[in-house]
Amino acid sequence: MRCNERNKKKAIFSNDDFSGEDTLMEDHLQLREKLSEDIEMIKASLKNNLVCSTLNDNEILTLSNYMQFFVFKGGDLVIKQGEKGSYFFIINSGKFDVYVNDKKVKSMGKGSSFGEAALIHNTQRSATIMAETDGTLWGVQRSTFRATLKQLSNRNFNENRSFIDSVSVFDMLTEAQKNMITNACVIQMFKPGETIVKQGDYGDVLFILKEGKATVFINDKEIRVLNKGSYFGERALLYDEPRSATIIAKEPTACASICRKLLNIVLGNLQVVLFRNIMTEALQQSEIFRQFSAEQLNDLADTAIVRDYPANYHILHKDKVKSVKYLIVLEGKVELFLDDESIGILTRGKSFGDQYVLNQKQKFRHTVKSLDVCKIALITESCLADCLGDNNIDASIDHNNKKSIIKKMYIFRYLSEQQCNLLIEAFRTTRYEEGDYIIQEGEVGSRFYIIKNGEVEVTKNGKRLRTLGKNDYFGERALLYDEPRTASIISKATSVECWFVDKSVFLQIIQGPMLTHLEERIKMQDTKVEMHELETERIIGRGTFGTVKLVHHKPTQIRYALKCVSKRSIISLNQQNNIKLEREITAENDHPFIIRLVRTFKDSNCFYFLTELVTGGELYDAIRKLGLLSKPQAQFYLGSIILAIEYLHERNIVYRDLKPENILLDKQGYVKLIDFGCAKKIQGRAYTLVGTPHYMAPEVILGKGYGCTVDIWALGVCLYEFICGPLPFGNDQEDQLEIFRDILTGQLTFPDYVSDQDSINLMKRLLCRLPQGRIGCSINGFKDIKEHAFFGNFNWDKLAGRLLEPPLVSKGETYAEDIDIKQIEEEDALNEGEPLDGDDSWDVDF
């Protein structure tokens, strides 16, 4: 049985609207310059504050400067229980009483603070505070506090990133890789006279001076002074060797530091990454290798032989080369000779050998000689064989071309790798002469075609519509449906060559749940739906902003879900931008494990999202029926969620509210991620506190900026809930501040009945408080999670191809709500009323 049952958790979305508390504080605000003792008291209080626990002294001082002075008389109300809070206060003088439900529970004096939760978001006050005597407070508004945190965080990131750009060892890294390193920077403070590094010691840290000065000594002799922007120790990231100098802080000095261990976590071995980047870029410049898949290029980079050569060395000699087919210069310079005549010089990142890769039987006629000490990557016949398997170069490129074409089409896009490869192998080639009919309008078709060479004309009722050429395709619907062709395709060139596959072959490869899924998805997309054609059957769900109805399309009887969102609720809660963003993101989503939007409507009262109907109920309920999940069950659900979240992250979309309540199961038992009200397209970092408290990552709470890493944390919470039962942090808490406190400082523990070490290890690594150390947040992304030992026996390909048996398949239909149609009119009436004042042009895109 699942222990520690919990109620469904709701998302919160912080905003900084003007509140009654803001108005009240205006009456008590007085200008006063802070004395040194005031600043010290404020700093001490802030350091004990949950949200400020990770800030350095300079950041604490900056926040102290934004504190305002408030004066109260005995009996004055400061904050009121139940009202939305927006200020955090520190008592400067006097006594203040705390009341809960009109009962006095304690008194507070100088140095005490209250209202901490208001710094995080606009939650209701849990107590009333009144001045017992005349007194004064230092206070800061949430909007000011979080805006200051954002400003400090942005300034720090941008400054660190500019320093990273100046370090030559990072020159060949990508923008994403440099950002990874910037996020991994740790600030270290040194006092005057303090040693930063010592000559002869072995080190693994790179230091960049952010503030202050430092002196360089070699053999106790002063050599020079380093200023802001100088860096030292870069070789420590690459090599195990002693420091060549001693460096001592000359004045109070701040350094951004990067250690090799953390760098290996977020990026991998720096030298390997640098060389891999050079190889990948060189291969992508090759006429041959640019036609390889990304996976094949990675395999080549992994198997390439990297060697060091001295100056003036014959690396490859025309009479002695046997297996080498391609070379890439990683460091140094080489000279290329043909028939003993120099034909060019290759520098770092340059490559050579296309002709020998394309024709592997051709004898190597060139000579390659090093001009200075250099490092070369060599690709041999064996490397190519490991990468391509049994295929030759032409066959591999042909396979890749077909794959790139069919992956653009929804009917094939989400086939498993095995299904996709079987389909490609099933393609046959056929030729047509000029004027030949390839398919004829009105005939029932059974073949799908891709144009390999030549051009064809598309005609309908004898009228020419358009011309198709190489890599264009037609006839894909014939693989699923017995229906007449809607147009004719006629060979236009002297000779047209096409790849084709027959329906009978396709149906041997694609069967069962995947075939049913494709048929239903395409049928849904084919149907043109208008609002007046929909008939409501019942209410199947409800949320903060409205209801979800089960409707059917009267002309076709296809059933859909219709999410009805109240305009009044959206406007009153200032969520206009978020509902627009939800529509934009949902409309672009196209993944089998994410809810599919058909179209949107609007009227004077509501917005409407028409989506596919998902009938298997919520994952929240499913895991309660199943009890504690077995490892295979947890693998299935977590793996499915990972594929959906990975799809979003590839498009720079952070979901921000991942939890079992936001995942439905379809009639086959596979997952559907729903409700994109908290999602955001992200460039750089986001700062808004949004999501469900128990599932929030630490970086969301702290307010210093976050990215897609927050969804990885939520995966860890879900996995913990699947396997352990309760939530990992704040399980017994409803007070949001206490939930946040446990997320930031609580110990992660595991029940005695959970003994699988792979599961425990993955949960620990997903629930790492430092995002840069969290599995799935390195440059490898979700690959690290998929290759974790927890998924050691899991078949990702079968999951994608719907070839796994789900843990639970609903008997009949299950919905979060099931309200009879008679109550629907009452629900609709709640959305009606006089329009709210304000600009109504914001919803023109609906």
UniProtKB/Swiss-Prot annotation:
<dbReference type="InterPro" id="IPR035014">
    <property type="entry name" value="STKc_cGK"/>
</dbReference>
<feature type="region of interest" description="cNMP-binding domain 1">
    <location>
        <begin position="51"/>
        <end position="166"/>
    </location>
</feature>
<dbReference type="InterPro" id="IPR018488">
    <property type="entry name" value="cNMP-bd_CS"/>
</dbReference>
<keyword id="KW-0479">Metal-binding</keyword>
<feature type="binding site">
    <location>
        <position position="106"/>
    </location>
    <ligand>
        <name>3',5'-cyclic GMP 1</name>
    </ligand>
</feature>
<dbReference type="Pfam" id="PF00027">
    <property type="entry name" value="cNMP_binding"/>
</dbReference>
<feature type="binding site">
    <location>
        <position position="486"/>
    </location>
    <ligand>
        <name>3',5'-cyclic GMP 2</name>
    </ligand>
</feature>
<dbReference type="GO" id="GO:0005952">
    <property type="term" value="C:cAMP-dependent protein kinase complex"/>
</dbReference>
<dbReference type="InterPro" id="IPR014710">
    <property type="entry name" value="RmlC-like_jellyroll"/>
</dbReference>
<feature type="binding site">
    <location>
        <position position="466"/>
    </location>
    <ligand>
        <name>3',5'-cyclic GMP 2</name>
    </ligand>
</feature>
<keyword id="KW-0418">Kinase</keyword>
<comment type="similarity">
    <text>Belongs to the protein kinase superfamily. AGC Ser/Thr protein kinase family. cGMP subfamily.</text>
</comment>
<dbReference type="GO" id="GO:0005524">
    <property type="term" value="F:ATP binding"/>
</dbReference>
<dbReference type="InterPro" id="IPR018490">
    <property type="entry name" value="cNMP-bd_dom_sf"/>
</dbReference>
<feature type="binding site">
    <location>
        <position position="115"/>
    </location>
    <ligand>
        <name>3',5'-cyclic GMP 1</name>
    </ligand>
</feature>
<keyword id="KW-0547">Nucleotide-binding</keyword>
<feature type="active site" description="Proton acceptor">
    <location>
        <position position="657"/>
    </location>
</feature>
<feature type="site" description="Part of a catalytic triad required for cGMP binding and cGMP-dependent kinase activity">
    <location>
        <position position="477"/>
    </location>
</feature>
<keyword id="KW-0067">ATP-binding</keyword>
<keyword id="KW-0723">Serine/threonine-protein kinase</keyword>
<feature type="binding site">
    <location>
        <begin position="540"/>
        <end position="548"/>
    </location>
    <ligand>
        <name>ATP</name>
    </ligand>
</feature>
<feature type="domain" description="AGC-kinase C-terminal">
    <location>
        <begin position="792"/>
        <end position="846"/>
    </location>
</feature>
<feature type="compositionally biased region" description="Acidic residues">
    <location>
        <begin position="825"/>
        <end position="846"/>
    </location>
</feature>
<feature type="binding site">
    <location>
        <position position="476"/>
    </location>
    <ligand>
        <name>3',5'-cyclic GMP 2</name>
    </ligand>
</feature>
<keyword id="KW-0808">Transferase</keyword>
<dbReference type="GO" id="GO:0005789">
    <property type="term" value="C:endoplasmic reticulum membrane"/>
</dbReference>
<dbReference type="InterPro" id="IPR011009">
    <property type="entry name" value="Kinase-like_dom_sf"/>
</dbReference>
<dbReference type="InterPro" id="IPR002374">
    <property type="entry name" value="cGMP_dep_kinase"/>
</dbReference>
<feature type="region of interest" description="cNMP-binding domain 3">
    <location>
        <begin position="288"/>
        <end position="391"/>
    </location>
</feature>
<feature type="site" description="Part of a catalytic triad required for cGMP binding and cGMP-dependent kinase activity">
    <location>
        <position position="525"/>
    </location>
</feature>
<dbReference type="Pfam" id="PF00069">
    <property type="entry name" value="Pkinase"/>
</dbReference>
<feature type="binding site">
    <location>
        <position position="485"/>
    </location>
    <ligand>
        <name>3',5'-cyclic GMP 2</name>
    </ligand>
</feature>
<keyword id="KW-0256">Endoplasmic reticulum</keyword>
<feature type="domain" description="Protein kinase">
    <location>
        <begin position="534"/>
        <end position="791"/>
    </location>
</feature>
<dbReference type="InterPro" id="IPR000961">
    <property type="entry name" value="AGC-kinase_C"/>
</dbReference>
<dbReference type="InterPro" id="IPR008271">
    <property type="entry name" value="Ser/Thr_kinase_AS"/>
</dbReference>
<feature type="binding site">
    <location>
        <position position="475"/>
    </location>
    <ligand>
        <name>3',5'-cyclic GMP 2</name>
    </ligand>
</feature>
<dbReference type="InterPro" id="IPR000719">
    <property type="entry name" value="Prot_kinase_dom"/>
</dbReference>
<feature type="binding site">
    <location>
        <position position="563"/>
    </location>
    <ligand>
        <name>ATP</name>
    </ligand>
</feature>
<feature type="region of interest" description="Autoinhibitory segment">
    <location>
        <begin position="1"/>
        <end position="22"/>
    </location>
</feature>
<comment type="subunit">
    <text>Monomer.</text>
</comment>
<feature type="site" description="Part of a catalytic triad required for cGMP binding and cGMP-dependent kinase activity">
    <location>
        <position position="526"/>
    </location>
</feature>
